[in-house]
Amino acid sequence: MWRVCVRRAQSAVPRAGLGDRWAVLKDGPVAPCGSSRAGPGAARFSSGTPSYGVRFLCGWSSGSDTAPRNRLLRQLLGSPGRRSYSLPPHQKVPLPSLSPTMQAGTIARWEKKEGEKINEGDLIAEVETDKATVGFESLEECYMAKILVAEGTRDIPIGSIICITVGKPEDIEAFKNYTLDSAAATTPQAAAPTPAPAPCAAPTAPSAKAPGSSYPPHMQVSAVGEQRLESWKLRLGVHLSERPCLKEIRETAQDSFEVQEEGYLAKILIPEGTRDVPLGAPLCIIVEKQEDIAAFADYRPMEVTSLKPQAPPPVPPPVAAAPPTAQPLAPTPSGLPAGPKGRVFVSPLAKKLAAERGIDLTQVKGTGPEGRIIKKDIDSFVPSKAAPAPAAAMAPPGPRVAPAPAAGVFTDVPISNIRRVIAQRLMQSKQTIPHYYLSIDVNMGEVLLVRKELNKMLEGKGKISVNDFIIKASALACLKVPEANSSWMDTVIRQNHVVDVSVAVSTPAGLITPIVFNAHIKGLETIASDVVSLASKAREGKLQPHEFQGGTFTISNLGMFGIKNFSAIINPPQACILAIGASEDKLIPADNEKGFDVASVMSVTLSCDHRVVDGAVGAQWLAEFKKYLEKPITMLL
């Protein structure tokens, strides 16, 4: 619906700037749609408010200009009221929420550079969330005037301004030296400075839930401007009908804040009376199902670090202070900077080439915009022979310092958000879940024969793999032994009535577990199709959150690498994970002339949470699993 509103403004004043379009949206004859439901744009872009989709922002409120939705519409359209008066009309683009659990993101790559034209639907940047790398698109035609957050900047809070766009190319030059700090200094409000808003928090320091904890599907409602929260109109557990008054906030006037979808209020994160609630601060949690409320009793929003890029480590002070009249130890090579006084600006390609060639970027003079080092600088760089001289001309004797390692000895790989989440969840699992392991050998002879026949029948339509049989057998075994299809929920053990099998998939970004939903009622052909589609989307980083969040049982298969057996780590809050090894030909006793047969035997290991699944129960599950694979015809019963 947001796309519709913008298009209406553009059609009314096609050559107008963003500020003029704002006026049309607010007062003109073509008003925004007042529906509370989303149009096609909602699936393509989330607003700059954390976990607050476009569909929640559709329409112009009949209240004052400071009504929450109106204020955010004004911010996203770049109205004059939200810009510096000395600058042309422009739009401050905030970091959007790109996944239900996203609290902060990393700019993986800017797809548009400063000065470039951005067409409607163009990809602006790729953002690394806590789950995947996701791109977000522009909803209207504009120009990239200024990038405020450099590539690779980590832990950017949702709602933080990341770039500036303008409607006219001639306005780009005005933002050449634009920064968020300078913008604050030139706004009228700067004349009456106010104390910096304190972080919005409960009176006592929250004891955050263990890192990596998972929660049912939910929506995190966040502040759309600096506010004072006056009162909550609804209490925990109350059912929210469409567009109820949720809370009252105070800024220049007292307004009510509405939600646009049904649900249940599961958690209030900001108490009544809290002052200076900053933009993007999480206010409350809303869930779709009433039974999910209890899961958020100890929910705390994830803390994020400052928006500013991490500064390089400070240069250590000299070992011995030189006299005031002392001369430099050695002249700096001609044409080279004396040394970095801060961050070295370098393009991603140049940085990669420098690492491969062992080139010290501090010795390279950049010829790109504002001294940025580009590929041409790396290609033309010639190491100076005089460079080692400073090492020989040491300062007066002092404590010895270990020499720096030679270039190219190692590479520090930054930890991605996905890798950080994997580390947190696996650490939590090994430290808090009492694992035990059960192994068994399975004769795969019958499965291989059935698979061969089925693939002949499906020739040209796809193939069924051994892994598809394993998924189906696991799902049916979970129906027979439901304790293995359960979840530890701290206060209760949740026994699931459907089997959603998570399948571990290795991707360049890390491990992810897309889900085959309702595997117990799906046929082998459908399971095979689902697995191929999910694995492809996982490797391309195109999985949607609902496709990998949840699951009741997990399978990890390393048999294709020749691994005979291994023990997998449980994926909380699930109770079991099945590790699949490679199949091997083994001799087994047989009632024939030779007295033996050669069988393809596969070794599997079931990791169980002893809080949920006792040893005998785990053994029963493996017995059922083995029966289904050794007699695959029983899967039809």
From Swiss-Prot:
Organelle transit peptide residues: 1-85
Q: What is this protein called?
A: Dihydrolipoyllysine-residue acetyltransferase component of pyruvate dehydrogenase complex, mitochondrial
Q: Catalytic residues? A: H610, D614
Compartments reported by the entry: Mitochondrion matrix
Q: Which GO terms describe its cellular component?
A: mitochondrial matrix; pyruvate dehydrogenase complex
Q: Kindly give the SUPFAM superfamilies that the UniProt entry links to this protein.
A: CoA-dependent acyltransferases, Peripheral subunit-binding domain of 2-oxo acid dehydrogenase complex, Single hybrid motif
Q: Report the residues modified as Phosphoserine.
A: S99
UniProt cross-references to PROSITE patterns, sorted A to Z: BIOTINYL_LIPOYL, LIPOYL, PSBD
- Quote the biased-composition stretches of kind Low complexity, using this chain's numbering: 201-211, 322-333
Indicate which residues the UniProt annotation says bind CoA: R451, S465, S556, N557, G581
Q: Which sequence positions carry the modification called N6-succinyllysine?
A: K463, K537
Q: In which tissues is it expressed?
A: Detected at higher levels in cauda epididymal spermatazoa than in caput epididymal spermatazoa (at protein level).
Region entry Disordered, spans: 80-100, 189-219, 307-340
Signal sequence, start to end: none
Instruction: Provide the organism lineage as a comma list.
Output: Eukaryota, Metazoa, Chordata, Craniata, Vertebrata
Extract the CDD domains matched here: lipoyl_domain (cd06849)
* Reaction(s) this enzyme catalyzes, per UniProt: N(6)-[(R)-dihydrolipoyl]-L-lysyl-[protein] + acetyl-CoA = N(6)-[(R)-S(8)-acetyldihydrolipoyl]-L-lysyl-[protein] + CoA
Cofactors per UniProt?
Answer: (R)-lipoate
